[in-house]
UniProtKB/Swiss-Prot annotation:
This is (E)-beta farnesene synthase MBR_03882. One of its GO terms (molecular function) is carbon-oxygen lyase activity, acting on phosphates. Keywords: Lyase. Its EC number is 4.2.3.47. Terpene synthase that catalyzes the conversion of (2E,6E)-farnesyl diphosphate (FPP) into the volatile sesquiterpene (E)-beta-farnesene. It catalyses: (2E,6E)-farnesyl diphosphate = (E)-beta-farnesene + diphosphate. It is an enzyme of class 4 (lyase).
Amino acid sequence: METDSFKRQYADILRRYLCGISYQKLSCEYDPSIEETVVQHFRTLNFPNDFLKRMMPIIHASAWIATSTYPFTPRHVQEAIAVYTSLAIAIEDTSKESTHDLKRFQQRLFNRQPQPNLLLQAMVDCLVSLRGIYGPFICDMVAKSTAEYISVCAFEAKYDGTLRPTPSSPDFPYYLRLKTGVAEVYAFFAFPEVLYPEEAFLHEYILAVPDISRYFNLGNDLLSFYKESIVADERLNYIYNCSRVSNSTPLESIWSTHLALITCVENIRKTLSASPQMRRNIDQLINGYVMYHFGASRYKLSDLGIQEVDELRAKICCSTTVDNGVGAYKH
């Protein structure tokens, strides 16, 4: 592709996207004490020191996701989200060296057997601990999605780089994206019991969960494309898979993705219009997830000359640097 021209067109689509969702920068800032709490949590799990050192950029990224995307939740909820995210990223990052354990995760889980892998056992313990923070239905959905995610990590470790969907399999790109992104988990994370008890609110927010999940997936696909496929040469991501099944160009797929995202946000706001507080909180989530990508240097969006990115990066560089460095995680 003609890189400079593509960059300009991509940046223009991002500007249109920000306008289309009425993006507003939030006042939330990175809280390093949440990162410290997560680090201490992992120290209690007896992980080797060299592995903890490897985990540090992952924990940093996870704390930024929790604080930027869920600023309306109490601190203990953000800490739980950061712990879960750290484990999810680490499980994917180590999937090629632990494929055997990943494949047997659910078998051991249902047989009530301990996991031989420290990360997998820590994830089981994390799922249990969430039951004091979220309602039973949400915890069931989180456990279900996590089990799928761990299975697909093993799947990708074997088939990564070999699956190329065709026009006869048009639904496969998003099907795979659903499995790899655990977006349903992050949609439900917005509704802890302390804010939205299931007994009173499940029937309201469940209607918005499909679009919130889609927003997480497609939002990451749109905002991570630059670092994946313009700076780097990734050609097997969601955008390129969509191009293959629709016989379109990558730029056309980016355009259609940004339109789908705007529709998601419109649907969410309409669905939650009868619940003003819930809508305000999810608006914070929508804007905060954009801020997460803008503030994390790994996405390299400061290369594009977008005012909103430059303003946020300047603020971050004057305070706490947010750089999630490593990790192949789909968020």
